[in-house]
Amino acid sequence: MLLPPALYSRLAGEPGAAEPLPVERNPAAGEAPFRFAPRAVRFPRDHEFFEDGDVQRHLYLQDMLTQVSETPEKSMVPEFTCQVAGCCQVFAAIEDYQHHYHMMHGNTCSFCNRAFPSGHLLDVHILEWHDSLFQILAQRQDMYQCLVESCPEKFKTSQDRKDHMVRLHLYPADFRFDKPKTNRGPAMPAAADAATRAPTDDSDAMEICSEPAAPPPCRRTYSHRSV
């Protein structure tokens, strides 16, 4: 094996050993020290180049399918009753209690104890049934809000609102949002306030939830099916 003369000098310890070794370039390469021409390389689908990616994809899909097939287990606890006064629902899972509380007690009117499925419907109910200025303003401007929270439309009467919701939002024709509450027992401030309002036709009213019934003496076990 032939070594460059400068390397012999460095190995022998001669005076010129500290000088850097000369770099000799191939004259055929021109000014660039090397030649490189990019080109596309195509591998078949079953080539070993894709093996690692195929393994990772398989593990990812397997993990996703496992998560979808697994049904989350409910946190089972000893049976307990609803903590709201007058409610005798019995629960065996915390998820059932949370669903019940959200639907029945989460948006409850403080005047008449009616429960609504959303805060928007509760606000509309309080405005229309427990605001003494509502009927006065309704004679001058459109005050009946659309029950769809994302819809800004207002109407002159509740019947106009009902027609709008049936026609545009595809609500059922027999859909009812509210109706006069039947007085039971001593008169409440809300009942007295409702008595001072102008009488309205029951056919114009719409109802989402029925009037809360008196709690039965027996226990009722609550359950719901998760979607």
Curated annotation (Swiss-Prot):
GO cellular component: nucleus
Recorded name of the encoding gene: Znf511
UniProt feature, compositional bias: Low complexity: 186-198
Xref: InterPro entries: ZNF511, Znf_C2H2_type
Listed name of the protein: Zinc finger protein 511
Domain of life, source organism: Eukaryota
Compartment(s) of residence: Nucleus
Keywords from the named record: DNA-binding, Metal-binding, Methylation, Nucleus, Repeat, Transcription, Transcription regulation, Zinc, Zinc-finger
Purpose of the protein: May be involved in transcriptional regulation.
Keyword flag DNA repair: no
